[in-house]
């Protein structure tokens, strides 16, 4: 069984969750882009990228996250990254060393992410 998945969860009403699980790189970046475009294409109130089960992200994944953030800003859709309560240190670190923590609203729980996606303006 391949533990690398990217799933779209629409069970939270007006906020869609793109759940990223496992190691992701240039080979799975197109799938992430597709899921993010699919989520943004429905004109939700917000999109959450759930990285709580991600174990590795390369630069192509970071590029996909940045592009989706840009699209969310253009569409005034809330965009939040959820690292989870105990994120994989490598995932958290890559966001820190690339300077992306201030670019994305980053939270630790799905509840926090849902609240932030619904209440924060997209350009925050």
Regions found by a protein language model. Give the residues of each.
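STAS-typified acidic loop motif
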Residues: 2-34, 53
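Short, solvent-exposed coil/turn elements at secondary-structure transition points
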Residues: 23, 85, 110-112
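Amphipathic alpha-helical interaction surfaces in cytosolic regulatory modules
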Residues: 26-103
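Alpha-helix termini
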Residues: 35, 111-112, 122
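Short acidic-hydrophobic, aromatic-tinged amphipathic segments that line or gate anion-handling sites
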Residues: 103-113
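A cross-taxonomic marker for long C-terminal extensions/tails that follow the last structured domain
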Residues: 118-124
